[in-house]
Amino acid sequence: PNLGFYRNFHKILRISDVNYVYRKKNIADYEGVGAKNIKVLLPYYIERNNFKEDCKDTIPIAFLGHFENDGRDKYIKALIDAKVPVTVYNGSDWEKAPLYEGIKSCIKPGKREKEYNHTINECKIAIVFLSKLNSDTYTRRCFEIPATQTLMLSEYTDDLNRMFPADECAVYFKSPEEMVEKCKYLLSH
């Protein structure tokens, strides 16, 4: 969108009865342009698109998502270096990764719609990375993965841990080393 779009968007925020934002951080952004009555509207999943399928766990560990230059390639490289089987779906963005040469063997084309849900169902473990550019503390994928009853392995945030308590509903990591350790443990049990 161009500058005119944002100028009009900001005007509308000031006269709207209610403004919904994606994350708590955005409340201050909206207040900064004069918006009132701001509420967080969490992302969710769509039941007809995200559901448990009767299929085998044929993919040990996967990340289904875009590349962002926030260090996620270091996590994937750490898994590869530790000989932990990992697949990344959504290939083209990942060519921009600083560590692309070391991780390209595990990168596959993206999955959409029915294939996306089916692929998550085939995973024993589905990884969640959070956008640092957007200051995410959760993402829509955090709701889609549990809908399939696939184990969710995610970067830790307080928000996620409140929604999905650690080691009950999800498993969390704070470093590449911890991620590798948890993946090895989970795959062996």
What is each of the regions a protein language model found here?
Residues S175-H189:
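C-terminal "capping" alpha-helix adjacent to the active site of nucleotide-linked donor transferases
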Residues P1:
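Short beta-strand/loop segments at the ligand-binding rim of alpha/beta enzyme cores
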Residues G4-Y172:
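Nucleotide-sugar donor-binding catalytic core of glycosyltransferases
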